[in-house]
């Protein structure tokens, strides 16, 4: 039986890592030993930041809603409490979108919420 070597497999693995490391600075884009460390760290950052993105966007939506509501004499917490009382089930993403792009629709929602404070 002939000896099974992993020449093609390791070559493909190295190519895959180096392709992923394209654009990195210094030896990180050409030297496999350096590149694999950088790629693994980049994947860890990507994993972490996919979760943080959700947190960041929620904060952004809250800031936008708060700014838009304050123009009408309310505070974010009062507005959200009033929305719950009126049983208007619109999430923060849509409310922020309305506040930025469709101010007439947002004003009507604010007026309905003001009636229940």
UniProtKB/Swiss-Prot annotation:
GO terms for cellular component: ribonucleoprotein complex; ribosome. The keyword Zinc does not apply. It comes from the Bacteria. One of its GO terms (biological process) is ribosomal large subunit assembly. Keywords: Ribonucleoprotein, Ribosomal protein, RNA-binding, rRNA-binding. The keyword rRNA-binding applies. GO terms for molecular function: rRNA binding; structural constituent of ribosome. Belongs to the bacterial ribosomal protein bL20 family. Binds directly to 23S ribosomal RNA and is necessary for the in vitro assembly process of the 50S ribosomal subunit. It is not involved in the protein synthesizing functions of that subunit. HAMAP family: Ribosomal_bL20. This is Large ribosomal subunit protein bL20. It comes from Rickettsia peacockii (strain Rustic). The lineage of its organism: Bacteria, Pseudomonadati, Pseudomonadota, Alphaproteobacteria, Rickettsiales. The gene is rplT.
